[in-house]
């Protein structure tokens, strides 16, 4: 099967941003999820970073970076009017205490039940570093996953059961891939939108679990 059109990382970030509601408190995980900050437009959304920052704006313009203003992924960020800095422990209290509406995280695998594996593949010699992902997965009211649909070797990242170490159990609400948007339901993964030049049957063949129309 040849896919000639699928979402880029930027387009995936735009699609996630479209589903973030006005007034939401949101944590953007390290990596591709941080791109979402650039596509929120005029919506009033409060972006949180686990290193102790609330009220982040989009990425700074080239040449306007402030080395004292970075997110948890060590990327330069901007601060909106009214933004605040606070202790790392206070930041994790926000994460664990259910004060964040949405966490947008990357993933290696998501199971049909919404289990999340995003911090370690079990590869020999690799250094596991879960960071705050477990706190976000269990503490945020909703978890949006942003990931490629397939691995580099063509295997589905949607799986019946996660084979990598878990970050959270039944914590994922929505999955945004370069091919589709899926909702985690008690019955399974429901296709909300197909974002590539394939139909439902072709998407099903590429997915490691049964999908619901």
From Swiss-Prot:
Keywords: Aromatic hydrocarbons catabolism, Transferase. It catalyses: 3-oxoadipate + succinyl-CoA = 3-oxoadipyl-CoA + succinate. It comes from the Bacteria. The active site is at 50. Pathway: Aromatic compound metabolism; beta-ketoadipate pathway; acetyl-CoA and succinyl-CoA from 3-oxoadipate: step 1/2. PROSITE patterns: COA_TRANSF_2. InterPro entries: 3-oxoacid_CoA-transf_B, CoA_trans_fam_I, CoA_transf_AS, NagB/RpiA_transferase-like. GO terms for biological process: beta-ketoadipate pathway. Its EC number is 2.8.3.6. GO terms for molecular function: 3-oxoadipate CoA-transferase activity. Belongs to the 3-oxoacid CoA-transferase subunit B family. NCBIfam families: pcaJ_scoB_fam (TIGR02428). Heterodimer. This is 3-oxoadipate CoA-transferase subunit B. It comes from Pseudomonas putida (strain ATCC 47054 / DSM 6125 / CFBP 8728 / NCIMB 11950 / KT2440).
